[in-house]
Amino acid sequence: LASAVCGLCLYASFAPLRWWFLAPVGVAVLVAALRGRRPRAAFGTGFLAGLAFFGLLVDWASESTGTWVARAGLGAVLALYTAAMALVWRELFESLGDRPLLLAPALATVWVAVEQLRGAWPLGGMPWGTLAFGQVDGPLLRLAPYGSSQAVGFAVVAAGVLLEAAVRVARRGGKASAIGASACCLAAAGLVFGPLFLPLPPVSAGTGTVAVGFVQGRIPAKSEVSGRLRALTVTENLAAATRRLEGRGADLVLWPESASDLDAHTDPDAGAVVEEASRRLGVPLLLGTQRYPGDYRYNDYIAWLPDRGPSGRYTKQHPVPFGEYMPARGFFRLFTSAVDQIYLDMRAGSGPALLDVNAGGRRLRVAVPICFEIGYEGIVNEAVRKGAQFIAVPTNNASFGHSAESRQQFDMTRFLSAETGRTAIQVSTVGVSGVAEPDGRVHHMTEPWRPEARLARVALRSGTTPATRVHGYAAAFYLAGAALGGLALAQGLNRPGGNGKRREKGGR
């Protein structure tokens, strides 16, 4: 039951609910559930908590594939990380005892390190469910430009550990216990609300502004049209919606990922639609297209200049396993035929995720992480360190139906805007699309599954936040801390009685 409550609380902190304050509560429940557990029970408790959390969070995986296997499989794999973390936590309980001021930073360090590992390995990792991405409506967002998702996640977990300690100490009764519980509550509140008093880092906004249009089209149902004609219809629908921006003074217009699944470089029909839209606007158009050089494909985001055609390209460097390419296809076909829905594997390009384009009488440098790449902070931070003035996040969410996937992704966009000190625009094939500001404000939001065209005045910023500068080093720090925790676990399990036979208070 405690595992389910933990998972529910963590899930509720993310979109669509965004009850950010439940994340520390979920952590507190997990801490309480793990106290006194033997190793095997701790692993099981952590796994069930992770399964409840991720199984709810990634419901869009079944929406995308049409089978429950994808959701269950992805949820179970991600839950293994929570299970492994629970084992390390359990050993830290044994080593550090009942000392919340030591346990809070220790457990938080391990949690963040496991998130870093999960976001990088295997197959490039999966950052979905990083605790910080559920805090965009809370006070901890102000911590993002100073310490990235790592510091925010650390604060959430440490606050949860202190909350559990406060409840446990208060139940003992007596004046000393009341004082101790109050101190733990105050410390937890300070971690969560203290960042409200932090100023925004002094990232320069002195390079002016630019008028950026972004367009959300309409994806026809497969029953309406299919194959090549369906891909061309998507591009035509975007071009039709783009006409709403004509004469409104846009300097640059963004289309989403997969705006042209036909190669706009080589397909004459797709290229003609894009060229006409760019020429009518009279400004550069950034759009997603695909290349098919052989029995594989690339996912590109390109600049298209009126009367000149393609000029500049970024190729997605982090294709999504099981979504854009199928690893070990033969093996996984033993479990489901859904693997063959991906009939042409996508290959990785290289970074940085940048496009340079002349617009509004100046040379612009735009960070362009494609779709899920917005969750990989290293990709975005690299682009900003190399001079990106704002962030465009082209994405195709059509496969995920009416699930919360696009809103969860937009929250990542919001977080990275705050982390990097850059205005960020998410532009989706079907929504949601919108603009996120570094101070947490959101504007020009679209309704999903409706053609939309919006025009936003975007500040062009230079300079970097502390988080952008140190993100990679901080990740190494947390991983080193977790490695020490892992050594403690190994030593603990090798001690006499370390297999769980030694007496433990409250053993179950």
Which residues does each predicted region cover?
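Residue-level detector of intrinsically disordered, flexible termini
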Residues: 22, 27, 40-41, 175, ...
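Membrane-embedded alpha-helical bundles of multi-pass enzymes
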Residues: 1-199, 401-402, 413-416, 428-439, ...
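Soluble catalytic domains of enzymes that build or remodel membrane lipids, polysaccharides, and related
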Residues: 197-474
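Cytoplasmic C-terminal tails of single-pass
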Residues: 499-508
